[in-house]
Structure formats: structure tokens, C-alpha cells
Regions:
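An exposed, glycine/acidic-rich loop-and-rim segment of catalytic or binding clefts
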Residues: 1-341
Length: 341
């Protein structure tokens, strides 16, 4: 169940891989480097279909798309790589121009996580992020639990605790293509429905530049299912080359916040979450990212559905009721479930 590769990660040690299989033959694979979700093969019409974008294990340190990685300490962007915490200004490591993206140059995706335990249907990884890591305050202990169910669901649970107040926002950066992630099909031909009434406008650098807006009469209205391509790159999407925006999830944990359906409707993905927001990214800059088969992905080859809090929340007290600032000694816990049908 736990396999070591013949080649080494940047720390000089082999990658460790874990594969899980359910009673239907669905298989998922994970890696300790970045606590990464490597592969997801779902039974469709008697065959296994790869629905997760990925590359060769040895190529993961060199790709910049965060394929399937656990992202932290703060997923998404923090403007100008700084924010106020109490009476202090916290200065972070910038890694996207003057901003910080996904936790900095050495975020959680670039760390060796410890395999704490694994079984037939689960694996749990842990990581210690020290005080000062990428500029963030506090020693943070993080755990992620991946579980594969016999209902063809993958559940991801993040748990953390810090000894100081800190910014904290964890997510998984998987890219999905239900038609077949190996063939490079354009994900814009999928149908998408979002249980979301509000979205967050951003500028060309992905930094919020407006209060939350209602989706009515905009290209961000997915309350009724529509092809992703239908209103693509209209209006505010022009500066981001497509969808790369956060939506506030209408709170009903027992109901999916996402329904993604393949073009011929032979496979769908429902997403349920305890998180307040969802970042929808249509792979606008995937071109050149390595595949598993010695090729490269094109733009729009997959869609990331990143459950999280809002970007740049540490600089926006008005959004902190959605999460983003973790108090010392308090338990951080959130879950997301991906259901394939």
C-alpha cells in the first residue's frame, strides 16, 4: 500500500506513494510530497477513467500549477505580501510579483509531509510549519486525511492548530476533467452548476478590487447549469483570461455547492464542503504543464474547484467571518467531499 519511488524528491529522499481502491474498482493515489492527490480513476461504463490532471512524479517539483497539492499556509493571494495582525504588520515572502500566492515560495505543496497512518480506504499526512515560515507567525501542526468511500467519493479533511494567531487557509488544488484527463480535452465543454449567489471581483493580478457582487445578470451566474464556455471570457473575466474567482457558497452542507458534468453526461462530480467559499479556476495558464505521458497540457485542460475562504482575507476584516485568521490554541477543521456519479 505504501510504495517508495526509485527517484528522489528535492530533499534527497524517495517519494512515498499510497494507492487506495474501493469495492467498485475506483482507485486514487496520493504522495507525501505536498500531501498531493496524484490520480483518480473512476469506473465509467466498465472502464476506469482518469479524471485528475497530473504529471510524472519526478516532474512535480518543477511544475507550477500546484497539481493536486495541499496548499498553505494561506491558499490564494495576499496582496502586497503583508497584512495587519493585531498591532503588527506581518511581512510575508512574495512569490507572484509583489504578492504572495498559495503560501509563498516554499509553501506546503513543496514540503515533505509525514505519512502518519494508512489503511485500505484512507491515508493521513501531517506537517509542522514553524514560526516564521514564509513570514507567517506561529508554529502550526497540520493534518490532512484522505478517505475513499464505496460510494465513489473522496473526502478531504484538514485539521490544524497554531500556538499564535496566524493567517490560515488550506485547500487541495486538484484539477478535474471528467471527459478524460489524459487526453487533454477542453474542460470548457463541461456543464457547471454552482450553489452560489455572490462572487468576488478581482483585478488582473487576482487581487480583490471590489466588495462581493451578486451573480445576477453576469457571466458568473451558474445557479442554473450551463456550459462553462457559454459566457467565457466575458466582462470581468477578460483580465484573468477566464474564470479565476471566488464564490460564496450558499450554506447547506447536505447539498452540493458544485455539480460538474461531462459533455456526454456519462459522469458527474458533486462537491460538498464545510468551507465558506469556492475558488473556480478554469486552468487559464496550464499551457506547458507536463502530463503523465511526456506531453504538455494546454490552457483550459482542467478545472480547479478549491474550497477555501476568500482571497486576501487577512487584509479585509469584513470577510473574516468566513475564516482566514486562526486564533492561537483553537482547532482548525474543515472538510470537502468529491462525489463521482
Amino acid at each position: 500500500m505504501l510504495e517508495k519511488t526509485a527517484f528522489n524528491a528535492p530533499d534527497g529522499q524517495p517519494y512515498q506513494l499510497v494507492q487506495l481502491t474501493n469495492s467498485n474498482g475506483m482507485t486514487v493515489q496520493f504522495m507525501d510530497w505536498g500531501a498531493t492527490w496524484l490520480s483518480c480513476k473512476v469506473p465509467v461504463n466498465g472502464e476506469l477513467r482518469e479524471v485528475l490532471l497530473g504529471c510524472k512524479v519526478e516532474d512535480y517539483p518543477n511544475q507550477t500549477a500546484y497539481l493536486g497539492a495541499s496548499v498553505g499556509r494561506y491558499a490564494n493571494r495576499i496582496a502586497n505580501a503583508q497584512f495587519e495582525l493585531g498591532e503588527r504588520t506581518i511581512h510575508l515572502v512574495a512569490n507572484q510579483g509583489k504578492h504572495q500566492l498559495h503560501g509563498g515560495k516554499e509553501g506546503f505543496d513543496k514540503r515533505r509531509w509525514k505519512v502518519e497512518e494508512c489503511g485500505q480506504n484512507f491515508v493521513r499526512f501531517s506537517l509542522v510549519s514553524p514560526d516564521g515560515d514564509q513570514g507567517f507567525e506561529g508554529n502550526v501542526q497540520v493534518n490532512v486525511l484522505y478517505t475513499l468511500t464505496d460510494e465513489n467519493s473522496v473526502k478531504i479533511e484538514y485539521e490544524a492548530e497554531s500556538d499564535k494567531d496566524t493567517a490560515l487557509n488550506l485547500t487541495n488544488h486538484a484539477y478535474f476533467n471528467l471527459e478524460n484527463a489524459e487526453q487533454g480535452n477542453d474542460v470548457r465543454n463541461h456543464t457547471l452548476r454552482l450553489n452560489a449567489d455572490f462572487y468576488l471581483p478581482v483585478d488582473g493580478e487576482g487581487i480583490p478590487n471590489s466588495p462581493l457582487k451578486h451573480v445576477v445578470n453576469t457571466s458568473f451566474d451558474f445557479r442554473v447549469a450551463k456550459p462553462i464556455a457559454q459566457d467565457f471570457q466575458q466582462g470581468e473575466q477578460v483580465v484573468t483570461k477566464g474564470y479565476d474567482h471566488s464564490f460564496i457558497v450558499n450554506k447547506a452542507w447536505q447539498k452540493p455547492c458544485v455539480l460538474l458534468t461531462s459533455p456526454n453526461e456519462d459522469l458527474s462530480l458533486e462537491v460538498l464542503t464545510s468551507q465558506a467559499a469556492l475558488q473556480v479556476y478554469t486552468g487559464n495558464y496550464l499551457a506547458g504543464t507536463p502530463t503523465r505521458e511526456d506531453g504538455t497540457y494546454q490552457d483550459f485542460s482542467g478545472i480547479a474547484l478549491e474550497t477555501q475562504c476568500l482571497p486576501d482575507t487577512p487584509n479585509h476584516p469584513e470577510w473574516q467571518n468566513y475564516g482566514g485568521i486562526q486564533k492561537a490554541g483553537e482547532r482548525y477543521y474543515q472538510w470537502t467531499e468529491f462525489r463521482f456519479k
